[in-house]
Amino acid sequence: MWRPHLVDTARLKYLGIVDALEADIRAGRVTPGERLPPQRAIAEALGVDLTTVTRALNEAQRRGLVSAQVGRGTFVRDEPAGDEGGGTPLDLSMNIPPQPAEPDLRRILPQGIASILTSPRGTLAMHYQESTGAPADRTAAASWLAGRVAGASADRIVVTSGAQAALFALCALLLGRGDVVAAGAVTYPGLKAVAAQQHLELAPVAMDEQGILPEAFEAVCRERAPKLLYLIPSIDNPTTATLPADRRREVAAVARRHGVLLIEDDPYAPLRSERLPALAELAPELTWHIATLSKCSTPALRIAYVLAPNAAAAVRLATVLRSSVLMAPPIFAALATRWITDGTLTALASAIRAENRQRQSSAASIFSGLDFAADPDGHHLWLHLPQRWRAAEFADHAERAGLAIVPASAFAVSPHPAEAVRISLGIAPDRGMLEEGLTQLSGLLTQPAVGSRAVV
């Protein structure tokens, strides 16, 4: 049976236990299938508390070293992970919503598709559709948007295969090579990708804790003459800022004065408890509103709705989509319509919001005393680093510790972004694993910052 001991060089005791166990497994001192001592016995042997041992065994499971069997104990796996990095990293980089226990997507997704295929609409769901979307889907989309955007009508809506496809098509429709797009000083990386592909210039707009500054937007309009402003007004990605109602009105007024079009990317609005006026309400003649379902249900449902300024504009966007993706996936569009009409989508958004709040509460406790921004309804946070750390180096150190996060450079439009990282809370399979990862990150912040790679 394994003789518990610690690797003294580990930065945290529980990691010292795991590192010692892993070394013994690799060296053959502990054999596959061997049962480990009870947790209490390990704690007594090492002079640590039971919580430390529990964390150690959870980490050992994450690394693929052991498996726990209810009622029998913890056993060394037959094929422990052989990766040098110590197992599969905990991904805190992908901004995916947590999957709630109920409604269970693994159950309702296949059930919903099967139900559609056996319904009167089943045959149509396997046919080509209009590039604007089927009438039933556009009507359902209008009802879904009605609670957040006054005046949304089906004839102004285009059903698309996700927000990124919608953004690419909108830029292709509205802009030409060399045109200037204004965006926050840090912004959604998908916009940067589109700008690079379509040879657009990005002009950074200064931000504070509430989002872009109207006076900074005004200055960019005078100095760079952008054709379009892109923004995420609710729970911004990555900063988590939400534009207050008054500031939204100011931004709309600036856009109207300078004739600047607006792309309002609003994926997180269904998760927010408080309703704020959409830019599509404040400046409907200028605004293209994107409402994806990925953040309030699952990225597997590749559906986003675009609310155009008017019906004719919706048809023009559909023409661009016809030449690229042709149409949104009909089976998913039909499923989204069903979930809107039977209340499933509302239930999913509500369950995700509740889980987000639990995870944000855990993060706030673990990161207490640190400088970070978060929205209780969102599933990411924006962590400002201590002065000794650079964001890229911290992200690299985190990766070496088995944690994936995103440095500010991935979002930067301005040349000198803040030393900050985005941490996504949703993809961790459970709160326990998330808390373990956040605790590791918090511990990493206390270490001296050193260069992650040798320079020769």
Swiss-Prot record:
Record Gene3D superfamilies: Aspartate Aminotransferase, domain 1, Type I PLP-dependent aspartate aminotransferase-like (Major domain), Winged helix-like DNA-binding domain superfamily/Winged helix DNA-binding domain
Chain residues forming the annotated DNA-binding region: 39-58
PANTHER family attached to this UniProt entry: HTH-TYPE TRANSCRIPTIONAL REGULATORY PROTEIN GABR
Pfam families on file: Aminotran_1_2, GntR
Family the entry assigns: In the C-terminal section; belongs to the class-I pyridoxal-phosphate-dependent aminotransferase family.
Protein name from the UniProt record: Uncharacterized HTH-type transcriptional regulator RHOS4_30730
Domain HTH gntR-type: 11-79
PROSITE patterns: HTH_GNTR (PS50949)
Residues found modified as N6-(pyridoxal phosphate)lysine: K295
The keyword Transcription appears for this protein: yes
Tree of life domain: Bacteria
CDD domains attached to this UniProt entry: AAT_like (cd00609), WHTH_GntR (cd07377)
Keyword terms, alphabetized: Aminotransferase, DNA-binding, Pyridoxal phosphate, Transcription, Transcription regulation, Transferase
One Gene Ontology term of the molecular function aspect: DNA-binding transcription factor activity
Entry cofactors: pyridoxal 5'-phosphate
Gene source species: Cereibacter sphaeroides (strain ATCC 17023 / DSM 158 / JCM 6121 / CCUG 31486 / LMG 2827 / NBRC 12203 / NCIMB 8253 / ATH 2.4.1.)
Biological process according to GO: biosynthetic process
InterPro entries (UniProt xref): Aminotransferase_I/II_large, HTH_trans_reg/aminotransferase, PyrdxlP-dep_Trfase, PyrdxlP-dep_Trfase_major, PyrdxlP-dep_Trfase_small, Tscrpt_reg_HTH_GntR, WH-like_DNA-bd_sf, WH_DNA-bd_sf
